[in-house]
Curated annotation (Swiss-Prot):
Similarity field: Belongs to the ClpX chaperone family.
Disulphide linkage map: none
Keywords carried by this UniProt record: ATP-binding, Chaperone, Metal-binding, Nucleotide-binding, Zinc
Self-association state and partner proteins as the record states: Component of the ClpX-ClpP complex. Forms a hexameric ring that, in the presence of ATP, binds to fourteen ClpP subunits assembled into a disk-like structure with a central cavity, resembling the structure of eukaryotic proteasomes.
Binding site for ATP: P122, T123, G124, C125, G126, K127, T128, Y129
Designated name of the protein: ATP-dependent Clp protease ATP-binding subunit ClpX
Residue sites binding Zn(2+) per the record: C13, C16, C35, C38
Any one of the GO BP annotations: proteolysis involved in protein catabolic process
Domain of life: Bacteria
Functional description taken from the UniProt entry: ATP-dependent specificity component of the Clp protease. It directs the protease to specific substrates. Can perform chaperone functions in the absence of ClpP.
Domain ClpX-type ZB intervals: 1-54
Length: 426
């Protein structure tokens, strides 16, 4: 054991050599001693290493082409939206890395601004699923919020800070990890103000919510009630910085196409102008031509639009795309139901015309890809009820007639085994 000869029998730290008189605390172990200063130093080293391990590594960050390729495995169609999202997400996390390097070296000459994303398009076309798949690939916390439940602070409804609580919960209350997560705000078109002109009366669930969202979209130090609900003075808050949180704001924006049509149609005035019929204007991809003034006319305030510089539009899915969605992605519905039937020892098969009929039904109902599962459930319900109680079924074949005329699927009986035939003959 280390001693200091001229100071009596003083113990000293086995790591830095300081005596017990030179430090505040000396902790003894089996044959060794460590002082409080060395403990603090070790703690700092460990925290720095853990922080480095938690950060999104730039060299590990997938390139835009790799992000798009990953999305292709789960989402059919929407190629323009995939490219837009891939570039926006890559640039967002590259910006976070640049900020971290600037803090370390203090030499970053340009401060990179955040680019949140606005997604436009009809319901059931993959907006939510695209965002969920992105978060899954990047392994970052992901939260979904419904804009229709939000109200301005002080009114009945949810405060905008509750959106951040969902993200913190998705990160298991790891605030540092939540600060690099993704928040998807759906139904944002429902918080458009009622008219293009500013209202004299209070619009607490429309323009008021847009105003309340401005700060967290841009980046702020927000105080979040740990149990949700309304804030009150006697509770503790979780502090979260939203500067590096990526917001994807989405909505169906029904009626926006008419605003775009009116603006695009006005181009056909004057000599030599290309004149288009209303039918031709209506069939083009309106959302791809959306301009900020169209969104302002729809009811979003300019400050809100300004914080959503990246616009990604999704289009209605045609019959061919819906058929591909049923069978091709990694989590395709056909694969899911096939697996369910396999668990009962039965093979499930869909005729090609049956898949086309299911796609036609979804288009007719106007539910897009979201309605495919409901149709599949209706078609397969009778056999899913009977099959578990039977042991004589080898295969179930779903045909076009099954979908359109409520005819039961074709049942292929199972051939009895040699033992069963022997027992039967005996």
């Amino acid at each position: 054991m280390a001693r200091i000869g001229d100071g009596g029998d003083l113990l000293k730290c086995s790591f830095c050599g300081k005596s017990q008189k030179q430090v505040k605390k000396l902790i003894a172990g089996p044959g060794v001693y460590i002082c409080d200063e060395c403990i603090d130093l070790c703690n700092e080293i460990i925290e720095e290493e853990l922080a480095d391990a938690d950060d999104v590594k730039l060299d590990e960050l997938p390139k835009p082409a790799e992000i798009r390729e990953f999305l292709e495995g789960y989402v059919i169609g929407q190629d323009t939206a995939k490219r837009t999202l891939a570039v926006a997400v890559y640039n967002h996390y590259k910006r976070i890395q640049a900020g971290e390097k600037a803090r370390d070296s203090r030499s970053e000459p340009v401060e990179l601004a955040k680019s949140n994303i606005l997604m436009l398009g009809p319901t059931g076309c993959g907006k939510t699923y695209l965002a969920q798949t992105l978060a899954k690939m990047l392994n970052v916390p992901f939260a979904i919020a419904d804009a229709t439940a939000l109200t301005e602070a002080g009114y009945v409804g949810e405060d905008v800070e509750n959106i951040l609580l969902k993200l913190i919960q998705a990160a298991d209350y790891d605030v540092k990890r939540a600060e690099t997560g993704i928040i998807y705000i759906d139904e944002v078109d429902k918080i458009a103000r009622k008219s293009e002109n500013p209202s004299i009366t209070r619009d607490v669930s429309g323009e008021g919510v847009q105003q309340a969202l401005l700060k967290i979209l841009e980046g702020t130090q927000a105080s979040v009630p740990p149990q949700g609900g309304r804030k009150h003075p006697h509770q503790e808050f979780i502090q979260i910085d939203t500067t590096n949180v990526l917001f994807i704001v989405a909505g169906a924006f029904a009626g926006l196409e008419r605003i775009v049509s009116d603006r695009v149609g006005k181009r056909g005035l004057g000599f030599g102008a290309e004149v288009k019929s209303k039918a031709e204007i209506d069939t083009q991809d309106h959302f791809a031509e959306v301009m900020p003034e169209d969104l302002i006319k729809f009811g979003l305030i300019p400050e809100f639009i300004g914080r959503l510089p990246v616009v990604a539009s999704v289009t209605n899915l045609d019959k061919e795309s819906l058929v591909q969605i049923l069978s091709q992605p990694k989590n395709a519905l056909v694969k899911q139901y096939t697996r369910l039937f396999e668990m009962d020892g039965v093979e499930l098969e869909f005729a090609e015309d049956a898949l086309e009929a299911i796609a036609d039904q979804a288009i007719h109902r106007g539910t897009g890809a979201r309605g495919l599962r409901a149709i599949m459930e209706e078609v397969l319900l009778p056999v899913m009820y009977d099959i578990p109680s039977r042991d004589d079924v080898a295969k179930v074949v779903v045909t076009k007639e099954t979908v359109l005329d409520n005819v039961l699927p074709t049942i292929v009986p199972r051939k009895p085994s040699r033992t069963e035939r022997r027992d039967k003959s005996a």
